Regions:
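Acidic/histidine metal-binding catalytic segments
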Residues: 70-78, 97-100, 136-146
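Extracytoplasmic and endomembrane cell-envelope/extracellular-matrix remodeling and assembly machinery
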Residues: 16, 108-189
């Protein structure tokens, strides 16, 4: 309740539920539903660490990231449709140009969606941290939990290049949150 009340939209209805699953995961769904895997709950070493994850997911809801993502997917669909039309027209004279147009359309649409997803994750981190602070939790819980995720190696980190990831690198997220936390006055309610 403290987190919801401190969120950018305290009137937003939120329903939390747990999923019996050992993985470290949480997610937000349309309508304000937020799911948390029991593995993540058990991995949190403090109330503030768990609250940091919930604040992040609340931010996805209050910032309307899901609706924005749906809109972005529609936009990507239009880009794909345009590339298909160009490919059809080009196929009459040169099949290689048609293939290139199709591949470029697919790559452009995918890259746009991945970049947008990373931007939403950064925003959810920032808004979630503000929510955490407003609710009186220890803001150090967010970078602390990110560090644990990084050590566990179970989320976010892989050998995939940054440009194909949906989430920012955990090291970058830790540095960003550490910098933001350093600028905040510590208070815990």
């Amino acid at each position: 309740r403290r987190l919801a009340a401190a969120s950018p939209n305290p009137q937003q209805g939120l329903d939390f539920f747990a999923i019996r699953d050992n993985t470290l995961n949480a997610f937000a769904l349309p309508g304000g539903y937020i799911g948390v895997h029991t593995g993540l709950i058990l991995a949190a070493e403090s109330e503030s660490e768990l609250a940091s994850v919930l604040g992040h997911e609340i931010a996805h809801v209050t910032q309307r990231h899901i609706a924005q993502l749906v809109g972005k997917q529609s936009q990507a669909g239009m880009v794909m449709l345009a590339s298909v039309l160009v490919a059809i027209l080009a196929a009459r004279s040169n099949s290689q140009v048609a293939e290139a147009a199709l591949a470029a359309g697919q790559a452009g649409a995918l890259q746009s969606q991945l970049s947008f997803s990373r931007d939403m994750e950064h925003e959810a981190d920032r808004v979630g941290l503000q929510t955490l602070e407003g609710a009186g939790f220890d803001v150090r819980g967010m970078p602390s939990f990110f560090e644990r995720l990084q050590r566990a190696g179970r989320l976010y980190e892989s050998n995939a290049p940054v440009y194909v990831r949906t989430h920012p690198l955990t090291t970058a997220r830790i540095a960003d949150m550490d910098n933001r936390v350093a600028q905040m006055r510590y208070r815990q309610v």
